[in-house]
Amino acid sequence: MTNTATNIGYITQIIGPVVDVEFTTGKLPQIYNAIIIGSGENAVTCEVQQLLGNNKVRAVSMTSTDGLKRGMEVTDTQAPISVPVGKATLGRIFNVLGQPVDNMGDVALDQTLPIHRGSPAFTQLETKPSIFETGIKVVDLLAPYRRGGKIGLFGGAGVGKTVLIMELINNIAKAHGGVSVFGGVGERTREGNDLYMEMKESKVINESNLGESKVALVYGQMNEPPGARMRVGLTALTMAEYFRDVNKQDVLLFIDNIFRFVQAGSEVSALLGRMPSAVGYQPTLATEMGSLQERITSTTEGSITSIQAVYVPADDLTDPAPATTFSHLDATTVLSRNLAAKGIYPAVDPLDSTSTMLQINIVGQEHYSCAQNVKETLQRYKELQDIIAILGLDELSEEDRQIVARARKIERFLSQPFFVAEVFTGSPGKYVSLADTMKGFNMILNGELDELPEQSFYLVGNIDEAIEKAKSLKG
């Protein structure tokens, strides 16, 4: 950020991450302007949030306010926080201010953009809904993603969220020539580090040639002040917007975790003197969420498809934070611990995951019928499981036994080997087109493959591989 401004003020009050500054000249910075306290490595950047009157402004710090004191000089940069964008960001890790934090040298600042920008105009939006093919069978068939849509990713610890995220990053790069931006918002530093290491291992980040990497990472972790956690999502979004608007690419934007964005806003809200709203959240909750979510969309040039991990506090879906998030989502991908325990990966729950795209007028009759028949078979199997547990399979009618056999094949066929998991599964990854996916499930539902053993459907790509696997199992 260039320090061309000469508008100088002085700190009058510090309350945690909130700093009050008086500009004696009477020339006040605009809302969202970045102001800098100190210089060099110890410089503290704050963002103006309120104009208090009497030539004073209230700002929220993006870094720790330790060591600041009243009377210190403050410089108005006369512009919002700006971050680097473009190819130089790929393979690198940034903080909320767009500074690299991976000890791999500086990033070229040829192109920077402010993190506060308007959403695209109505005339620029792509209004025709289209499916974003991921190459992952269970997602494309049962809960398809909308191009330029927002997807909620729900799942506890250890059920495969990270691996699913990395596979999506890999597939968008290979199939769509797109890139991804990962925004780590208020999550554990250890998880951020693990993700970075796994991305290097699976070649999503190419260490020898960073420009060939498929992702840029932006972190504002749990130990950072609320100001950083509140704005890091916007930093990641700004980098994604450049790839969409200038490079005209399809972009995947991951936000982990969207709840922490709201949480950071509520921490700052009371310090800014706002009256708390329901459950202690900020009164501006819907506005803040809307200003972030409305920028995530498809334009006629490219698209940003966002996948947001959603933490649900105390599993209460009516809590204002997740409830506000739900109103923006086009699809939900729910990861199931039961499926993970069975070794079925990706552990996406086919009955709990939903999508607004699964409508006849969008996906067509064939896709819709296939998806509904798969869900119907799995639902019936779920209902029969109690009877099977108590009385055994032999007590079922012939028709029910056939449903159970097909449902078990469907369940296994919903599993799939991932490219990014080759390192630890030893089996090559598979990208399965939607046409191949539908062909396979229709053959199972029609009874064409009733004689094949169910293990031949486990961890394969398309249905031809399952038939080949069955032959090799027979030996």
Curated annotation (Swiss-Prot):
GO biological process: proton motive force-driven mitochondrial ATP synthesis
EC id: 7.1.2.2
Full protein name: ATP synthase subunit beta, chloroplastic
Protein's gene: atpB
Species of origin: Guillardia theta (Cryptophyte)
Compartment(s) of residence: Plastid, Chloroplast thylakoid membrane
One GO CC annotation: proton-transporting ATP synthase complex
Known function: Produces ATP from ADP in the presence of a proton gradient across the membrane. The catalytic sites are hosted primarily by the beta subunits.
An MF annotation (GO) of this entry: ATP binding
